[in-house]
Amino acid sequence: MIDAIKNVSSLSATRGLGSIATDLSSAASNAIASTPETAIGSSAVGSFASVMSDVAKNTVSTLKEAENASFAGIKGTMSTREVVDKVMQADQTLQTAIALRDKMVSAFLDITKMQI
């Protein structure tokens, strides 16, 4: 079921989040190695996009793990406790992603209501 989610390109108007993350990976690695003052100046543009990409990828991978664990539990190859742990972790990750989405939509609506 979750395997149908291949990418999150619908979140970007022109390209998927994966390409944004690959474009900015060198800037992020340079920012980690540098001082805080230079990191703020060099990667402030791409940091939000890379964080959002990582959150989306983490959410999808956690949901896939929970789905695989539930199938393993049905087959009897995984204990009930492990299945419940994976499903609860996926539920918590999904609730976090939903809360993040709601905050982003709320912030966008606040920005659109501002007078110019």
UniProtKB/Swiss-Prot annotation:
Transmembrane segments annotated in the record for this chain: none
Cellular component, GO, one term: bacterial-type flagellum basal body
Keyword S-adenosyl-L-methionine included in the entry's annotation: no
Signal peptide (UniProt feature, chain positions): none
Main location per the UniProt record: other
Record-stated family: Belongs to the FliE family.
Subcellular location field: Bacterial flagellum basal body
Keywords in alphabetical order: Bacterial flagellum
Taxonomic placement: Bacteria, Pseudomonadati, Pseudomonadota, Alphaproteobacteria, Hyphomicrobiales
Underlying gene: fliE
Family matches, as HAMAP family: FliE (MF_00724)
Entry's Gene Ontology BP terms: bacterial-type flagellum-dependent cell motility
UniProt protein name: Flagellar hook-basal body complex protein FliE
One term of GO molecular function: structural molecule activity
Organism: Rhizobium rhizogenes (strain K84 / ATCC BAA-868)
Keyword presence, rRNA processing: no
